[in-house]
Swiss-Prot record:
Gene transcribed to yield this protein: rplX
Entry's Gene Ontology BP terms: translation
InterPro entries in UniProt: KOW (IPR005824), Rib_uL2_dom2 (IPR014722), Ribosomal_uL24 (IPR003256), Ribosomal_uL24_CS (IPR005825), Ribosomal_uL24_KOW (IPR041988), Translation_prot_SH3-like_sf (IPR008991)
Keyword Flavoprotein: no
Function: One of two assembly initiator proteins, it binds directly to the 5'-end of the 23S rRNA, where it nucleates assembly of the 50S subunit.
Subunit structure of this chain's protein: Part of the 50S ribosomal subunit.
Source domain of life: Bacteria
Protein family according to the UniProt entry: Belongs to the universal ribosomal protein uL24 family.
A Pfam family of this chain: KOW
Native source organism of the sequence: Pseudoalteromonas atlantica (strain T6c / ATCC BAA-1087)
Protein name, entry field: Large ribosomal subunit protein uL24
NCBIfam families reported for this sequence: rplX_bact
Listed CDD domains: KOW_RPL26
Matching HAMAP family: Ribosomal_uL24_B
């Protein structure tokens, strides 16, 4: 089944501690139905130093995954959350915004 939200899509968080935040999808994890979104769901990770890899230790902040049901794609025309549909154009499956029918 095709994914409604893909990498580099602009999304808005609908639920959770980061509700209302906008971000760009960095990575899609289809097996778990989760996304990694830039600047959203930040967690602190305690990193152990590893001189062989040149990694310094300390506490780093990184993005954790968020479930796909807690986000919606943003329609650039309206700037609001929108739903996605699929249709065929010239024997090719394309995504479109349900509110205005424009292609994603």
């Amino acid at each position: 089944m095709a994914r409604k939200i893909r990498r580099d899509d602009e999304i808005i968080v609908l639920a959770g501690k980061d509700k209302g935040k906008l971000g760009k999808v960095l990575k899609v994890l289809p097996a778990a139905d989760r996304l990694i979104v830039e600047g959203v769901n930040l967690v602190k990770k305690h990193q152990k130093p590893n001189p062989q890899l040149g990694v310094t230790g300390g506490v780093i902040e990184k993005e954790a995954s968020i479930h796909v049901s807690n986000v919606a794609i943003v329609n650039p025309k309206t700037g609001k959350a929108d739903r996605i549909g699929f249709r065929f154009e010239d024997d090719k499956k394309v995504r479109f915004f349900k509110s205005d029918g424009e292609l994603v």
